[in-house]
Amino acid sequence: MAEAAIDPRCEEQEELHAEDSEGLTTQWREEDEEEAAREQRQRERERQLQDQDKDKEDDGGHSLEQPGQQTLISLKSSELDEDEGFGDWSQKPEPRQQFWGNEGTAEGTEPSQSERPEEKQTEESSHQAKVHLEESNLSYREPDPEDAVGGSGEAEEHLIRHQVRTPSPLALEDTVELSSPPLSPTTKLADRTESLNRSIKKSNSVKKSQPTLPISTIDERLQQYTQATESSGRTPKLSRQPSIELPSMAVASTKTLWETGEVQSQSASKTPSCQDIVAGDMSKKSLWEQKGGSKISSTIKSTPSGKRYKFVATGHGKYEKVLVDEGSAP
């Protein structure tokens, strides 16, 4: 997971490194071409100096002004080298060493040439040497402006290219390395990969140090919803009690009869039955109908067997049942 999160940054850094490496390779090629051109010019000058020395040896005369001539030539060559872009000696140490080596060889040859016998140093040879010196000065002064213009033009182009290209932060990190002699591309790539790995480790450590915030996911919410539905389903639902005022089956049937109109026909057909009437009850009816009867007669009761009884008060709230004779009864 961590590698997938870091991939975009790594790709950007690799692209930047690729661009920087391409720019460095082009710059190195240009510098190599310039160095090759300078070396060719220096070799041509050395050949010319050697040819001049041979010509002078053939002429057979070297004046005392010869050391001064060699110093003038060395000074001119140094000026040309400075015009060609060798102002910063820290970046180009090799040509300087070659230059000092050439001077050492020239100085080493000077005493050998000066130690020649004085007999050969006649006026004619001195005159010829002066003429030859003037010719050589003219021949060296003629290509100087062109070389100076070419060197200055190359230096200006080099500066313009550096100004147009905006330095990237990774290139700024390698300024110390650029001040030193150019290293091989493999070492450059190794250093850059190390710096990339360090930056990746720093970013990973920063991400790990940050605390993860509690985020409610969809699964947690769904679980809460299911729990709520289960708890609501477990609660018993209140059963609806039937209303007390509902009519019974008999009332409902009579209602339907009234609606259909069958109640009147049924009431007309029904007649009151007298089967439940007892014979003893009729005697009570006759007793109640009699007016002005005695209290005793009110207490007499008849039974279905035909015997009559009466209740006689024996005490406070007490009565006794006494059989009544038929003769004594009114």
UniProtKB/Swiss-Prot annotation:
The modification Phosphothreonine is found at residue 166. It is a peripheral membrane protein. Residues 1-20, 37-62, 113-135 have a biased composition (Basic and acidic residues). Residues 66-77, 206-215, 223-242 have a biased composition (Polar residues). Its main location: membrane. Isoform 1 is expressed in normal mouse B and T-lymphocytes and in transformed B-cells but not (or in smaller amounts) in nine T-lymphoma lines tested. Isoform 2 is expressed in non-lymphoid cell lines (myocytes, stromal cells, fibroblasts). It comes from the Eukaryota. GO terms for biological process: apoptotic process; cellular response to interleukin-7; chemotaxis; cytoskeleton organization; defense response; signal transduction. Keywords: Acetylation, Cell membrane, Membrane, Phosphoprotein. Residues 291-302 have a biased composition (Low complexity). It holds the Pfam family Caldesmon. The modification N6-acetyllysine is found at residue 318. Phosphorylated by casein kinase II, protein kinase C and MAPKAPK2. Phosphorylation by PKC induces translocation from membrane to cytoplasm. Phosphorylation by MAPKAPK2 may regulate neutrophil chemotaxis. InterPro entries: Caldesmon_LSP (IPR006018), Lymphspecific (IPR002211). One of its GO terms (molecular function) is actin binding. GO terms for cellular component: plasma membrane. The modification Phosphoserine is found at residues 77-78, 168, 179-180, 184, 243. Residues 1-246, 281-302 are annotated as: Disordered. It is found in: Cell membrane. PANTHER family: CALDESMON (PTHR18949), LYMPHOCYTE-SPECIFIC PROTEIN 1 (PTHR18949:SF1). May play a role in mediating neutrophil activation and chemotaxis. This is Lymphocyte-specific protein 1. It comes from Mus musculus.
